Amino acid sequence: MRTLWIVAVLLLGVEGNLWQFEMLIMKIAKTSGFLFYSSYGCYCGWGGHGRPQDATDRCCFVHDCCYGKVTGCNPKTDSYTYSEENGDVVCGGDDPCKKQICECDRVAATCFRDNKDTYDNKYWFYPAKNCQEESEPC
């Protein structure tokens, strides 16, 4: 059900940030965020609680924490600008809030790329009942 909700949001807000996040994941990690990270572990996908299950899930935990620190705009819907310089994604634009959203997404996409070897199919569609431990602080 959570995946259907994400699909609906992505389709409705194609110009918004969730679509851009998907594009950054594809560009940096060379994989689909929607297919591999939209419902993984305790933190990848909508919401998040408990303890991250592995390094991949921790990427999502850190991303959630990063979004939680953004003030003045909506990380899940606001669009941002970025460019590529020498193969690296560089967040830009005049709005510091939107630039911060871009940085959250860039860091998460890089984390996914750097931790591909920790991805474990047993955490794909991981039951929320297994994420009941107390969450660690950001």
From Swiss-Prot:
Q: Where in the cell? A: Secreted
Q: Gene3D superfamilies of this UniProt entry? A: Phospholipase A2 domain
- How is the cofactor bound here? Binds 1 Ca(2+) ion.
**Which parts of the sequence bind Ca(2+)?**
43, 45, 47, 64
Q: Which GO terms describe its molecular function?
A: calcium ion binding; calcium-dependent phospholipase A2 activity; phospholipid binding; toxin activity
CDD domains noted in UniProt: PLA2c
Tell me, in a sentence or two, what this protein's role is: Snake venom phospholipase A2 (PLA2) that inhibits ADP- and collagen-induced platelet aggregation, has edema-inducing, anti-coagulant activity, antibacterial activity, and cytotoxic activity. In vivo, has a hypotensive effect. PLA2 catalyzes the calcium-dependent hydrolysis of the 2-acyl groups in 3-sn-phosphoglycerides.
Instruction: State the protein's name.
Output: Acidic phospholipase A2 BmooPLA2
Q: Which taxonomic lineage is given here?
A: Eukaryota, Metazoa, Chordata, Craniata, Vertebrata
